[in-house]
């Protein structure tokens, strides 16, 4: 032997550990991204709902005004 020992089992364990850590990091990043997206989407959803409600209220008022304007006067 020329004094070089290759620890195959150690190398495989190190690679397995490294891939495991990389996979966990990817999961953490994906989880953080999904949480951030949910945090952004929640207020946007509320705003959109409020906006639709406001439009519906305005449309109702307009229809009532138009109906009152064209209704025969007594």
From Swiss-Prot:
Entry comment on modification after translation: A short form lacking first Ser is produced.
Positions of post-translational Blocked amino end (Asn) modification: 2
Entry superkingdom: Bacteria
Single GO term (MF): bacteriochlorophyll binding
UniProtKB keywords: Bacteriochlorophyll, Chlorophyll, Chlorosome, Chromophore, Photosynthesis, Repeat
Ranges for the Sequence repeats: 7-16, 28-38, 39-49, 50-60
Region (4 X approximate repeats), start-end ranges: 7-60
GO biological process, one term: photosynthesis
Gene Ontology CC: chlorosome envelope
Subcellular localization(s) per the UniProt record: Chlorosome, Chlorosome envelope
Known function: Component of the photosynthetic apparatus which may bind the chlorosome to the bacteriochlorophyll a protein monolayer.
Family from the record: Belongs to the CsmB/CsmF family.
Name this protein carries in UniProt: Chlorosome envelope protein B
Gene that this polypeptide is encoded by: csmB
């Amino acid at each position: 032997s020329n004094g070089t020992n290759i620890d195959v089992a150690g190398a495989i364990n190190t690679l397995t550990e490294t891939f495991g850590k990389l996979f966990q990091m990817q999961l953490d990043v994906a989880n953080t991204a999904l949480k951030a997206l949910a945090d952004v989407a929640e207020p946007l959803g509320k705003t959109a709902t409020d906006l639709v409600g406001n439009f519906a209220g305005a449309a109702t008022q307009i229809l009532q005004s138009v109906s009152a304007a064209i209704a025969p006067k007594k």
